């Protein structure tokens, strides 16, 4: 692409996140650190040159591991190394090379119909990051038209926040924007939207201490991780968070003979969550709600009527991602504290 340099002024414009559904009850806490961790010694290591940027069962695994393994994985920022801290034009980018994912990991014993559990143990942000306004991308792409802005940031290892501008500090809350397993297709699917296999979830709740559940579609599951964010708001309205290289440590295991799930679900000590993707927020919200009803009926033994009403009483619907066309992602969180046997 033709490079057009743009001078980035110190003054910035902040755009408030727009809430389109009932939200907030489980919104990410601002209290965090640059490096979040539950330390564990890894059994295997994946480097940032062991990558791909599609989802397909035809992609050969970079690693084969037994269920229960702990893996350390290094990931590029979203452009796969095309941007550096000295970059200035967000359109000077080959979109065919973005979202390099570290993996895939073949998990021994994983079969279609199983669930793959990925427990996030450590996340460490790199020393720089970037944000951008890219023409044609983002929730307000029509409003901003041809405007293009790329800002890069030095990230301080000793700090707990990003120095966005003078007097504006945004707490670190690192997570992987893309996580997923291989779909049951030979087609090479792009990593742009969220799908049933995971993909571009862009969900800032998926931090250390979260266990993410994926339906398994192919033998070995073929799990990959990437598109790291040092921080991001729910919805990712401008199309990017704080994109940064990152180090992940996660435990991966197969769950057999359990209940089946159709899309990604996750939990922490505090809540259980379901997700729904669709081309509209309304349909995504309906799917996330239906999956929560399924969970309450199958795991907690409630009637579907009681599960529906409890979801209305205690569940929180949130927009996780609203910009990765053609799909959007809505999540529902239900606090575990409402149950008498809560941990």
Show which residues each predicted segment covers.
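Bacterial lipoprotein signal-peptidase II cleavage site
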Residues: 27-33
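Long, compositionally biased
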Residues: 325-343
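Alpha/propeptide regions of enzymes that mature by internal proteolysis
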Residues: 38-50, 56-61, 65-72, 93, ...
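Bacterial N-terminal signal peptides that target proteins for export
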Residues: 3-15
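Intrinsically disordered, low-complexity linker/loop segments enriched in Gly/Pro
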Residues: 122-208
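C-terminal motif of bacterial Sec signal peptides marking the signal peptidase cleavage site
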Residues: 23-25
């Amino acid at each position: 692409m033709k490079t057009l340099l743009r001078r980035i002024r110190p003054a910035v414009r902040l755009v408030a996140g727009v809430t389109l559904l009932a939200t907030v009850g489980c919104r990410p806490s601002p209290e965090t650190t640059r490096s979040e961790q539950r330390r564990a010694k890894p059994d295997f290591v994946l480097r940032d040159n062991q990558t791909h940027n599609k989802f397909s069962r035809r992609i050969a695994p970079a690693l084969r591991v037994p269920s229960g393994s702990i893996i350390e994985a290094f990931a590029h920022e979203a452009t796969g190394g095309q941007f550096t801290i000295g970059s200035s034009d967000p359109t000077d980018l080959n979109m065919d090379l973005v979202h390099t994912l570290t993996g895939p990991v073949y998990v021994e014993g994983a079969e279609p119909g199983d669930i793959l559990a990925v427990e996030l143990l450590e996340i460490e942000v790199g020393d720089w990051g970037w944000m951008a306004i890219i023409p044609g991308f983002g929730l307000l792409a029509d409003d901003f038209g041809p405007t293009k802005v790329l800002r890069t940031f030095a990230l301080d290892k000793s700090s707990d926040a990003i120095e966005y501008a003078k007097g504006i500090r945004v707490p670190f809350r690192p997570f992987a924007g893309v996580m997923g397993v291989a779909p049951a297709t030979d087609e090479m699917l792009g990593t742009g939207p969220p799908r049933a296999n995971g993909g571009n979830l862009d969900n800032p709740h998926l931090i250390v201490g979260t266990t993410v559940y994926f339906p398994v579609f192919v033998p070995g599951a073929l799990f990959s991780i990437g598109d790291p964010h040092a921080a991001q708001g729910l919805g990712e309205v401008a199309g990017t968070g704080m994109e940064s290289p990152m180090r992940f440590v996660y435990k991966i295991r197969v769950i057999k003979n359990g209940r089946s799930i159709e899309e990604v679900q996750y939990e922490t000590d505090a809540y259980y969550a379901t997700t729904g993707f669709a081309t509209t927020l309304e349909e995504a919200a309906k799917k996330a709600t239906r999956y929560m009803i399924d969970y309450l009926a199958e795991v907690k033994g409630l009637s579907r009527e009681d599960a529906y009403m409890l979801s209305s009483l205690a569940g929180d619907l949130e927009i996780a991602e609203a910009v990765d066309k053609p799909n959007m992602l809505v999540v529902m969180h239900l606090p575990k504290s409402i149950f008498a046997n809560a941990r």
